[in-house]
Amino acid sequence: VSESALIAELSPVRLLGKATGMIGVFTGLGQMIFLPLGLFMADSLGYASTYITAGLIGFLGFAMCLRIPKIKVTLAEDNDEEVNIIRVPTWKLVAVPALALTTFSMSYGAISSFLSPAMQELDAARGASLAGIMLSIVGGAAMIFRYFAGVVADRTGAPGSLYIPSQIMAIIGVGTISLTLFMESSIWWLVLGAVLFGGAFGIAQNEALLSMFDRLPRERVSEASAIWNIFYDSGTGLGSTLLGAMVAGYGYDGAFGAGVAILIAGLLLTTADFILGRTRVSETNDIRTRLRRMRKV
């Protein structure tokens, strides 16, 4: 939560897309390197070695935090002008990008939990060798495309412009996984589906965060970051649980098919938001809120 809010405070607005994209690059790179390294250390040196190493890395992070430059944080000022401004509830401003992100993270919860065993069930020989690196493939694609989304946002000055294309890309990716498992096709189609979804998920992560930063004033970037993390993590947990429950009754293909349906629901949500964008609520002095206030008076 704090890193995203800090990046928003440190970075100039014209570079905010790349800055948030770099969060994904370093997070993804760290996972790609240290997840397999941790498994190797646990097998060869024992689990204690992994916890000790993680603790030492934590101290390194603490030392780096001491080098963060001091900044003047933007705060909401309680003056007469602020009192007279009619504000819109936060949830109205961030509901669409947050819920759309949840549809992605729900599908990611299913992919991270069940894609590897599904691959082994489809092709025991090649599935066993590929299953161990599938999360790295998804994470690598997400890392690259998240930074790409940040570059596009900085150049166009329009955060959220790639949200709908990323949803279509994710639907194709998860749909490919579901259809491959249903038809028992080549396992390489699963790899393609994972790459497509990973790339789409990376774009969606950055677009959701930038959209929230864009819709909320600068003094509320901490709220935007917290909301982003809440919906991301809750979606991952819901996806693992709800779609996992479907595996028992409908198989892996049915669970991923349900993931496609969830992504389609998110696409309809963002499409409606895009069409109604001209009348979308703003952070202050929204017409609908003004009329409602006048009726009460």
Segments and roles (model prediction):
Residues 1-25:
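Cytoplasmic helix-loop-helix junction between adjacent transmembrane helices
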Residues 23-66:
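Helix-loop-helix hairpin linking two adjacent transmembrane segments in secondary transporters
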Residues 43-55, 247-262:
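A membrane-interface helix-boundary motif in multi-pass transporters
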Residues 56-76, 269-273:
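C-terminal membrane-cytosol helix-exit motif in multi-pass small-molecule transporters
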Residues 70-97, 287-297:
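Juxtamembrane intracellular "pre-TM" segments in multi-pass secondary transporters
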Residues 113-129:
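Short amphipathic helix-loop junctions that connect adjacent transmembrane helices
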Residues 146-158:
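Helix-to-loop junctions at the C-terminal end of transmembrane segments
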Residues 161-176:
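Structural signature of the two symmetry-related core transmembrane helices
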